[in-house]
């Protein structure tokens, strides 16, 4: 635990040093309006740079959230199934995985996995 | 003991940075020969010091800060992505290296999920349309493939009954998990390619559509850090492919050099795939994970749970 914390600290220092190195030794040059505008093909960007994006991506994130929570609930299974004497890890995980699979097929059937309609 | 662990982590992290540098050279050379040209061969002996020259060039390059950019997060995001890529290397198990404790794969899951934020931030804080679109695509792709990746990972850990990477490598002394979990191995490799945004799944920076995707506005040091992070992730994914499915090789060869050779081969596979296949279609990519991989991974996982329980008695 402490080892990982110290390791993270060392990495943080390495990264900050790399970043500062780049900020210090870079070649200075002139800057003008065209150069400092966001990259778009030759014309001024309109105001809405943070454009609205497709709803699909948001729905996908919602489905991902559900599955990720279920994965977190499944994770203890990895060490339980070999290290326990009862049948409960097996039974509960089978019920859980079946529900997960049926849920996935339900989503599929309802069309929330279709990228293009 | 703590000092030894720390030292081995730092050494493998520094070696990972070196490996990243020369992996970029391997990629350029390899792609060159795939396309019947030479690749970089002018610098030094056969272009060998090319990565060092690249590093000097990228770090001394002019740093353009576009006016609309949120400067501080814009600069921090690349550093954060390199940080997250390097954190993983403490899990690297070599012959000499003592590994971290029993929950190393949990650390891997957490850190690799955090990697999404740096890509999202890099796109969002650039305040440019191409960057935003690229980062949205990249995030959707990463989180989708994360689901199947964690389930495949779980199926490997299930056979060992532990969350520790060194444990799963020790258990493969006599037989590889790849023999038991062959299809999982194939799916894991494809998921790794998608997770690291590599061709043929490089929708995060599809050159012909979005100029350079989420790193359009980056140049100089920011670009260098993002680039190093990407290649560090690729190399760590190669390490994981070998450790999870062919773990026994850590005991093969002089000082366990078998691991290094196999990892280099998987790294080479990433380049080979890039040279061989045209870019996939985004909706097909999503169908591949949600409609093909996820149901099959869940089914195989159910099968494995039952068989592990029965074989365990």
Curated annotation (Swiss-Prot), chain A:
GO terms for molecular function: NADH dehydrogenase (ubiquinone) activity. It catalyses: a ubiquinone + NADH + 5 H(+)(in) = a ubiquinol + NAD(+) + 4 H(+)(out). Keywords: Electron transport, Membrane, Mitochondrion, NAD, Respiratory chain, Translocase, Transmembrane, Transmembrane helix, Transport, Ubiquinone. Its EC number is 7.1.1.2. Signal peptide: none annotated. Core subunit of the mitochondrial membrane respiratory chain NADH dehydrogenase (Complex I) that is believed to belong to the minimal assembly required for catalysis. Complex I functions in the transfer of electrons from NADH to the respiratory chain. The immediate electron acceptor for the enzyme is believed to be ubiquinone. This is NADH-ubiquinone oxidoreductase chain 3. It comes from Heterololigo bleekeri (Spear squid). The gene is ND3.
Curated annotation (Swiss-Prot), chain B:
The chain crosses the membrane at residues 6-26, 71-91, 105-125, 149-169, 173-193, 220-242, 255-275, 293-313. The keyword Membrane applies. It is found in: Mitochondrion inner membrane. One of its GO terms (cellular component) is mitochondrial inner membrane. One of its GO terms (biological process) is aerobic respiration. Keywords: Electron transport, Membrane, Mitochondrion, Mitochondrion inner membrane, NAD, Respiratory chain, Translocase, Transmembrane, Transmembrane helix, Transport, Ubiquinone. Signal peptide: none annotated. It catalyses: a ubiquinone + NADH + 5 H(+)(in) = a ubiquinol + NAD(+) + 4 H(+)(out). It is a multi-pass membrane protein. Pfam families: NADHdh. Its EC number is 7.1.1.2. One of its GO terms (molecular function) is NADH dehydrogenase (ubiquinone) activity. Core subunit of the mitochondrial membrane respiratory chain NADH dehydrogenase (Complex I) that is believed to belong to the minimal assembly required for catalysis. Complex I functions in the transfer of electrons from NADH to the respiratory chain. The immediate electron acceptor for the enzyme is believed to be ubiquinone. Belongs to the complex I subunit 1 family. PANTHER family: NADH DEHYDROGENASE SUBUNIT 1, NADH-UBIQUINONE OXIDOREDUCTASE CHAIN 1. This is NADH-ubiquinone oxidoreductase chain 1.
């Amino acid at each position: 635990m402490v080892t990982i914390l110290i390791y993270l600290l060392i990495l943080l220092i390495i990264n900050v040093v790399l970043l500062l190195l780049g900020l210090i030794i870079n070649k200075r040059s002139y800057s003008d309006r065209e150069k400092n505008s966001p990259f778009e093909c030759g014309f001024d960007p309109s105001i809405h740079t943070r454009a609205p994006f497709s709803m699909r991506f948001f729905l996908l994130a919602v489905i991902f959230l559900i599955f990720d929570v279920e994965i977190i609930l499944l994770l203890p299974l990895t060490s339980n199934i070999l290290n326990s004497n009862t049948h409960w890890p097996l039974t509960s995980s089978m019920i859980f995985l079946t529900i997960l699979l049926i849920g996935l097929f339900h989503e599929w059937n309802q069309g929330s996995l279709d990228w293009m309609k | 003991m703590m000092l030894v662990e720390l030292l081995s982590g730092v050494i493998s992290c520094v070696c990972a940075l070196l490996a990243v540098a020369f992996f970029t050279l391997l990629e350029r050379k390899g792609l060159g020969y795939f396309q019947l040209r030479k690749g970089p061969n002018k610098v030094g002996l056969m272009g060998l010091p090319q990565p060092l020259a690249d590093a000097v060039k990228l770090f001394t390059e002019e740093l353009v800060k576009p006016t609309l950019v949120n400067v501080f997060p814009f600069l921090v995001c690349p550093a954060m992505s390199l940080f997250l890529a390097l954190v993983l290397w403490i899990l690297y198990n070599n012959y000499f290296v003592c590994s971290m404790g029993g929950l190393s794969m949990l650390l891997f899951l957490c850190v690799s999920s955090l990697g999404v934020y740096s890509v999202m931030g890099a796109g969002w804080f650039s305040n440019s349309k191409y960057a935003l679109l690229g980062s949205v695509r990249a995030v959707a792709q990463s989180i989708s493939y994360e689901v199947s990746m964690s389930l495949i990972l779980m199926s490997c850990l299930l056979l060992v009954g532990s969350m520790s990477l060194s444990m799963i490598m020790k258990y493969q002394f006599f037989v590889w998990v790849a023999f038991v979990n062959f299809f999982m191995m194939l799916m894991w490799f494809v998921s790794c390619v998608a997770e690291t945004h590599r061709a043929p799944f490089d929708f995060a920076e599809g050159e012909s559509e979005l100029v350079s995707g989420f790193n359009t506005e980056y140049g100089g040091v920011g670009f260098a850090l993002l680039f190093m992070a990407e290649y560090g992730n690729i190399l760590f994914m190669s390490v994981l492919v070998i450790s999870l499915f062919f773990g026994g090789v850590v005991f093969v060869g002089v000082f366990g050099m078998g691991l290094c050779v196999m990892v280099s081969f998987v790294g080479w596979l990433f380049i080979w795939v890039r040279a061989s296949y045209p870019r996939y279609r985004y909706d097909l990519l999503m169908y591949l994970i949600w409609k093909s991989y996820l149901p099959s991974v869940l089914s195989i996982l159910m099968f494995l749970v039952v068989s592990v329980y029965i074989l365990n008695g």
